[in-house]
Amino acid sequence: MKQQANLIRAGQVIEHDGRRWTVLKQQIITPGKGGAFIQVEMRDLKTGNKTNERWRTADTVERLLTEEKEYTYSYMDGDNIVLMDPETFEQTLLPLDLLGDQAPFLQDNMVLVVNLVEGDPVGVTLPAQVTLEIIEADPVVKGQTASSSYKPAKLSNGVKTMVPPFIEAGERIVVRTEDASYVERAKG
């Protein structure tokens, strides 16, 4: 389905130059002189290569319709993840690189949404937030209270994040899977 370039959003799948691409980032740029244009960072679904494209906002692009299907994460198998269809209990093997930077946030029995184009998987969406344990946290530096000060901490999945000074090693926190940022202390 054709749509204007300025309506492209991250996560959509488009067809360009005879290939399928998933949109990673988009930004509308309005220069001081001349018309606005859209800068799009996208990844080739077949090769995994990234590229940047620029279109005028009035240009049209071919957007592919995606279908979303829920699966349950089972386990890792080399460079692949094994997912189970909760309705048919059928197992599906997907390449780990479909997850991108979110791969470390996978947890047993996590419900994932797989985006399909004509039956082919083109992307995987994790839950927006996960609960993890802090395994290392730097001590608080006294006297840094003039501004909101965060300190570095390492999560149980190996990812580093910034947490408020009252969070200590051994505590469980909620983090965003999109950017590994701290949300809150886990309840219960």
Swiss-Prot record:
SUPFAM superfamilies: Nucleic acid-binding proteins, Translation proteins SH3-like domain. Pathway: Protein biosynthesis; polypeptide chain elongation. GO terms for cellular component: cytoplasm. Involved in peptide bond synthesis. Stimulates efficient translation and peptide-bond synthesis on native or reconstituted 70S ribosomes in vitro. Probably functions indirectly by altering the affinity of the ribosome for aminoacyl-tRNA, thus increasing their reactivity as acceptors for peptidyl transferase. Belongs to the elongation factor P family. This is Elongation factor P. The keyword Hydrolase does not apply. Disulfide bonds: none annotated. The keyword Hydrolase does not apply.
